[in-house]
């Protein structure tokens, strides 16, 4: 159960309501009027709680669950225990996410500028926007309606922020335009200089970074992410991208819609990711590359060439996934063989 000190719960919701908002179907025999009061894991859910099964690995836990209702793929519905109502979905995790959002909606902005905030006379703050103590809103900045600006956040000169966007504590935004319903977590840095220098033994000369960062609607940017502004072209984060904590995005990078970038990954300057690319944790992409739509980059990979649409790569330097797995297997056999030889000599 979520700690009520931190999470405010809505509801209850009927099975019919949850089916409607999640796109799931009520299984035959289930009562559409059944009221659910909360969500919970399979192992701990009770008769007034909703759970879900997405991974077949947990089918045994599903068979033993005490949940009042469960979201499940139709193929696994036969494993359900007696007394558990079912919502059938071919995407159970997505359906669960929509239901969980209903039970635990994001808190709305309370509205109002704290007396402890610093708001420039030429800055504009929309209706219902909350500006916390210590926040700094610089000259010419425009913040939309229903936004939340956290403590000690800095919104730089002429920055624009769309409606319903949240900027976390101690984040700093400059040289950027932020869309609507964007979530920016604490410590994020957007719009600082890109890493651009004319290298020379006589001394490195900084190249002025004259672009911006454009963040489109419905993006999430995790804690302590850094996104450099463009050198001339803009750095662009496409609609619906999800960026995990501690990610570095270099100048002129372009992320297409729906990309997912996982923690500690890095993307060097001028690289372009098409839509719905997945970049796993600690992977790195060198500059000036093109990563095709739907490509998947394995964790800790080092990408040094273009990646075709839909291709899966891994390793450093990154190669097609099957080739990488063969390399790992061969290396393992070589190491084990060498170990056997060493043991023979020592014996």
Swiss-Prot record:
PROSITE patterns: HEXAPEP_TRANSFERASES
Active site location: 251 (proton acceptor)
Entry keywords, A to Z: Acyltransferase, Lipid A biosynthesis, Lipid biosynthesis, Lipid metabolism, Repeat, Transferase
The keyword RNA-binding is annotated on this UniProt entry: no
Alphabetical list of InterPro entries matching this protein: Hexapep, Hexapep_transf_CS, LpxD, Trimer_LpxA-like_sf, UDP_GlcNAc_AcTrfase_non-rep
The protein's Enzyme Commission number: 2.3.1.191
Gene3D superfamilies xrefs: Hexapeptide repeat proteins (2.160.10.10), MurE/MurF, N-terminal domain (3.40.1390.10)
A Pfam short name: Hexapep
One BP annotation, GO: lipid A biosynthetic process
Lipid metabolism in keyword set: yes
Domain of life assignment: Bacteria
One GO term describing the cellular component: membrane
Reaction(s) this enzyme catalyzes, per UniProt: a UDP-3-O-[(3R)-3-hydroxyacyl]-alpha-D-glucosamine + a (3R)-hydroxyacyl-[ACP] = a UDP-2-N,3-O-bis[(3R)-3-hydroxyacyl]-alpha-D-glucosamine + holo-[ACP] + H(+)
Associated pathway: Bacterial outer membrane biogenesis; LPS lipid A biosynthesis
Gene Ontology molecular function, alphabetical: N-acyltransferase activity
EC main group: transferase
Family: Belongs to the transferase hexapeptide repeat family. LpxD subfamily.
Role description: Catalyzes the N-acylation of UDP-3-O-acylglucosamine using 3-hydroxyacyl-ACP as the acyl donor. Is involved in the biosynthesis of lipid A, a phosphorylated glycolipid that anchors the lipopolysaccharide to the outer membrane of the cell.
Assembly notes: Homotrimer.
Protein name per the record: UDP-3-O-acylglucosamine N-acyltransferase
Naturally occurring in which organism (per UniProt): Rhodospirillum centenum (strain ATCC 51521 / SW)
């Amino acid at each position: 159960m979520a700690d009520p000190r931190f999470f405010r719960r809505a509801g209850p919701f009927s099975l019919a309501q949850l089916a409607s908002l999640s796109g799931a179907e009520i299984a035959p025999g289930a009562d559409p009027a059944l009221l659910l009061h909360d969500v919970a894991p399979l192992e701990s859910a009770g008769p007034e709680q909703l759970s879900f099964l997405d991974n077949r690995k947990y089918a045994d836990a599903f068979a033993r669950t005490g949940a009042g209702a469960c979201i499940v793929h139709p193929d696994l519905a036969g494993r359900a225990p007696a007394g558990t109502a079912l919502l059938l979905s071919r995407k159970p995790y997505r359906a669960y996410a929509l239901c969980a959002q209903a039970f635990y909606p994001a808190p709305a902005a309370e509205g109002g500028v704290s007396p402890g905030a610093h708001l420039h006379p030429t800055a504009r703050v929309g209706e219902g926007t909350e500006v916390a103590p210590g926040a700094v809103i610089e000259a010419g900045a425009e913040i939309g309606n229903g936004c939340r600006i956290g403590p000690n956040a800095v919104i730089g000169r002429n920055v624009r922020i769309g409606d319903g966007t949240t900027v976390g504590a101690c984040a700093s935004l400059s040289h950027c335009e932020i869309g609507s319903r964007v979530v920016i977590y604490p410590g994020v840095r957007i719009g600082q200089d890109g890493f651009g220098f004319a290298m020379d033994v006589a001394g490195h000369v900084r190249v002025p970074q004259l672009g911006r960062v454009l963040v489109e609607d419905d993006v999430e940017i995790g804690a302590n992410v850094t996104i450099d502004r463009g050198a001339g072209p803009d750095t662009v984060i496409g609609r619906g991208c999800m960026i995990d904590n501690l990610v570095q995005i270099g100048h002129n990078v372009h992320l297409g819609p729906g990309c997912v970038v996982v923690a500690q990954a890095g993307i060097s300057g001028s690289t372009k990711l098409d839509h719905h690319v997945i970049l796993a944790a600690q992977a790195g992409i060198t500059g000036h590359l093109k990563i095709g739509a739907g490509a998947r980059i394995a964790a800790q990979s080092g990408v040094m060439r273009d990646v075709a649409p839909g291709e899966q790569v891994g390793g450093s330097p990154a190669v097609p996934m099957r080739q990488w797995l063969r390399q790992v297997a061969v290396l393992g056999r070589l190491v084990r063989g060498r170990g056997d030889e060493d043991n023979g000599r020592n014996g």
